[in-house]
Amino acid sequence: MKLLFASDLHGSAYYAEKLEDLIRNEAPDKTVLLGDLLYHGPRNDLPREYDPKKVTAILNGLKTQVLAVRGNCDAEVDQMVLEFPILADYAVLPIGERLVYVTHGHIFNTQTPPPLRKGDVLLHGHTHIPAWEPFGRENLYLNPGSVSIPKNDTAHGYMTLENGVFTWKTLSGEPYHEWKMEN
């Protein structure tokens, strides 16, 4: 199974179209969106081609393959226009012997972790900064960065998981980091 993880679109039609192209090219079995889909939020500048209505149409076209969690900029009004669930605070994906806990990062993160077992993975967006860091009880924190508003001079990016390997990629599809899950 191949999964694609993306976070923090923040209403950018330009980057939603890029994501749509990536999904077509990567051909994942599921795309996991880590929140902050339509609204840019009060702390961010407007992203390139800010157009939440167009982003809604693009994402609704992908609805059969999307699993999404709620970000701090997502609201009930967003759920009214999106045709797939977006209001869950987290999802748990069994990958081999581990659980991958996917969330946005504003509620559960390395400072306030969910109830992880030894060796489980916490995967979230929110910071707009790619990450792969050990923490807790032999746990790992992963972050794909942001599709539309990367921070700390990082690339616009996303992440895939295939055959037990997480791969961080730029929006041009170029890999720049890998982490292999050990069972």
Give residue ranges: language-model regions.
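Short, Lys/Arg-enriched, disordered terminal segments
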Residues: M1, K180-N183
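Amphipathic repeat-derived elements
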Residues: M1-A13, P28-K30, L93, Y141, ...
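Core catalytic region of metal-dependent phosphoesterases/phosphodiesterases
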Residues: K2-I95
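Fold-independent oxyanion-binding glycine-rich loops
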Residues: D8-L9, D36, N72, H104-G105, ...
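Short, well-ordered secondary-structure micro-motifs
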Residues: P42-D45, D78-L82, A88, T112-P113, ...
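Generic structural signal for conserved hydrophobic packing positions in ordered secondary structure
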Residues: L59, L93, V102-H104, G145
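Conserved beta-sheet core of the metallophosphoesterase superfamily
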Residues: L99, H106-W179
